Regions:
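Extracytoplasmic
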Residues: 1-157
């Protein structure tokens, strides 16, 4: 029988995160670190680059594969779940401000508003937020994990 996917040369299995391990190993290891260092009863909130549903850019990859809540998920899904974009738009703007603002007090206020414990900075965030200055995150928190190009900052409380 012909397959929509063409001639499959190798068996991929059902491990849905395998591609991430191959394509974005730093993100993959960050997800494993989060799973090992958080508990289901006290899940922290993370902030990461948000995006569109099923995006080839792989936004929201940390929250999607770790199960840890994020400030905003895929925009269209969030919109459909809530029945309005009025909730989605301000959250997307807040995420942009976290990554692009130079005003540390503003960033702290937004992080507190959502109870963010971890800030993700990887390839996706660097590509999307052109004016991102990572030094500010070292000022408002500490690096708790780093693998390859992915850094996880824990927000100081």
């Amino acid at each position: 029988m012909r397959s929509y996917f063409g001639a499959l040369k190798r068996y991929e299995g059902i491990y849905g995160i395998a591609w991430l391990e191959r394509e974005h190993p730093g993100d993959y290891r960050t997800i494993l670190w989060l799973k090992e260092n958080t508990t289901p009863t006290s899940l922290p909130v993370i902030v990461e680059s948000d995006g569109d549903s099923y995006s080839p850019k792989d936004e929201n990859r940390i929250s999607a594969f770790s199960g840890i809540p994020t400030v905003i998920g895929w925009a269209v899904h969030e919109w459909l779940w809530r029945g309005t974009y009025d909730v989605v738009s301000p959250r997307r703007e807040d995420v942009r401000r976290i990554y692009e603002s130079d005003n540390l007090e503003e960033i702290r206020q937004i992080l507190g508003k959502y109870g963010v414990r971890y800030i993700v900075v990887g390839r996706m965030e660097r590509e999307r937020f052109a004016s991102l200055d990572e030094q500010k995150f070292a000022t408002i928190g500490t690096t708790v994990f780093q693998s390859g190009e992915t850094v996880l900052y824990e927000v100081a409380r």
